[in-house]
């Protein structure tokens, strides 16, 4: 992955890991250091829906967490996860003309199978947001799924039989999420 290319599109510091347990878990540990974007090639214990494991194959998918400190009232975050899902759906439509479906509260589906999950978590001080974690897992070039997930998960490559540029998708996701946060 060309992290230097991604860094050109944001002022937020980006930290890149070949392997990490979970960008979300690590994001909670380092949030005191300021805004950041964590991107991993592989996760050994990614967090999915209801705390389930989200597998991230090495060099194949997107596993990232955006850490922000928006200093807004907690009410401003109502509907944030769905708004992010709508943006990602729009990104994929504009880039590839593929139609993702949103499965509330936090999944994106392609042809009836899960392709992406969004996990948002906020911590408050009083009535204001102290920090916000936005974690995104997106199956881009994965073709091999576990027995447990092969019937319910998919990827762009599995569906369309070609490689996709993860950096371009990441750049668009970051730009769109940063715009959402700025407008809170």
What is each residue range found by the language model?
Residues 1-95, 164:
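N-terminal lobe of the biotin/lipoate ligase/transferase fold
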Residues 9, 72-100, 110-184:
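Long, positively charged amphipathic alpha-helical accessory segments at protein N-termini or as interdomain linkers
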Residues 18, 102-104:
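Short loop/edge segments at beta-strand edges and connector loops
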